Amino acid sequence: MQTTTTRNHDPARARAYFEDKLAFTTGPVELDRWIKTGQDNLVIVDVRAAEDFAKGHIPGAINVPKEKWDNPQGLNRDKTQVVYCYTQQCHLAANACVRFAGKGYPVMELEGGFETWKENELDVEEAATNRLKGSGEKVGAR
């Protein structure tokens, strides 16, 4: 016996969902544009493990791994925290957004995480060398 599942795709609920999605997520190309145009109302927050952050991260990002979420350093209540983790399937960033928003920080999630950032061939900063991959341009120590 074959069973067919039907979902109710209520237009009002769909609209509310997508309005929220647009308000609380951004994509890698949009974030890259914000970085390159010098938007200073953002804090880019990488919630991956410290060793993964050291191997490469979005330029200008700070690292706040899960064990530091209770007392996060570097966040700013006057700016929007753009939070990312490993991949689209990783829920660390979403969980961090819940935690940080609960502490009064404005948040957005980067869709696709660091994997999608790299797939778009956007610049990657390496902590060990203070170099940007992709542009060949050196960046100063932070």
Annotate each PLM feature.
Residues 70, 75-118:
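Catalytic cysteine-centered active loop of the rhodanese-like fold, especially the PTP/DSP P-loop
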Residues 31, 46, 61, 100:
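Terminal peptide-recognition signature
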Residues 62-70:
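Glycine-rich, highly charged phosphate/nucleotide-binding loops
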Residues 1-43, 50-52, 126-142:
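Flexible, polar/low-complexity N-terminal or interdomain linker segments that lie immediately upstream
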Residues 62, 80, 124-128:
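Short, hinge-like loop/turn segments at secondary-structure boundaries
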Residues 38-44, 59-60, 80, 106:
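Short active-site oxyanion
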